[in-house]
Amino acid sequence: MKHYEVLFILKPTLTEEEVNAKLEFVKEVLTKNGAEIETVVPMGTRKLAYKIKKYERGTYFVIYFKAPTNLIAELERVLRITEEVIRFLIVKYENKKEIAAWEKLSHGIKQSKKEIKPLDAPEIQ
């Protein structure tokens, strides 16, 4: 089984229940076809870089999963015909370096940023 990541953007006009239903639908398509879902990352509603199908915002989701290669064609077909999905991207991780990065991302380990510490300023009286 290969390592994959799918990012998809849902219409911003959907209610929270509809968004959850579409997320469950995509997860069901993956599991029915033999995928093992590692992590689902809801990224929230964000502004798009440019208008897509007359929308300026979208609700983003990323799913990290392992799957046989024949699943990808079915997933792509389902995402294309689902009206609520305005854009999607499927990424395949192939070499050891990419797979290591996939494992870090799928387990929620992110690169740590330097913490900004407040300056020690004297109190003003």
Swiss-Prot record:
Keyword Membrane: no
InterPro entries attached to this UniProt entry: Ribosomal_bS6, Ribosomal_bS6_sf, Ribosomal_S6_plastid/chlpt, Transl_elong_EF1B/ribsomal_bS6
An annotated GO cellular component: cytosolic small ribosomal subunit
Entry keyword annotation includes Nuclease: no
Superkingdom field: Bacteria
Annotated Pfam families: Ribosomal_S6
Protein name: Small ribosomal subunit protein bS6
Similarity comment: Belongs to the bacterial ribosomal protein bS6 family.
Function according to Swiss-Prot or TrEMBL: Binds together with bS18 to 16S ribosomal RNA.
UniProt KW keywords: Ribonucleoprotein, Ribosomal protein, RNA-binding, rRNA-binding
Gene3D superfamilies, alphabetized: 3.30.70.60
GO MF annotation list: small ribosomal subunit rRNA binding; structural constituent of ribosome
GO biological process per UniProt: translation
Top-level taxonomy: Bacteria, Pseudomonadati, Campylobacterota, Epsilonproteobacteria, Campylobacterales
